[in-house]
Amino acid sequence: MANHKSALKRIRSNETKRLRNRYQHKTTRNAIKKLRDADKKEAEGMLPSVISMVDKLAKKNIIHDNKAANLKSQLTKHVAAL
């Protein structure tokens, strides 16, 4: 266990950030699953918001930039193929 006040605060803030990151990542994953299961009209409506969510994760370094680019490409191709 940490002995310094700053180390204790860092532990608390890291846990808060970890929970926030997990929530955002899980929410985005659920949105991606819904998009993949949706019909064409519904999927086309959802695509911009899902892409925005993926971009926000990449911007906050929750996922890598290349993973975000790959996801956006896959989702766009999936919706176009419906």
Curated annotation (Swiss-Prot):
Residue ranges, annotated region (Disordered): 1-20
GO cellular component, one term: small ribosomal subunit
Pfam families: Ribosomal_S20p
InterPro entries: Ribosomal_bS20, Ribosomal_bS20_sf
GO biological process: translation
Source taxon at top rank: Bacteria
Keyword Amino-acid biosynthesis in record: no
A single MF term (Gene Ontology): small ribosomal subunit rRNA binding
Transmembrane stretches, start-end: none
Sequence ranges of Basic residues compositional bias: 1-11
Family stated for the protein in its record: Belongs to the bacterial ribosomal protein bS20 family.
Name the UniProt record assigns to this protein: Small ribosomal subunit protein bS20
Organism: Christiangramia forsetii (strain DSM 17595 / CGMCC 1.15422 / KT0803)
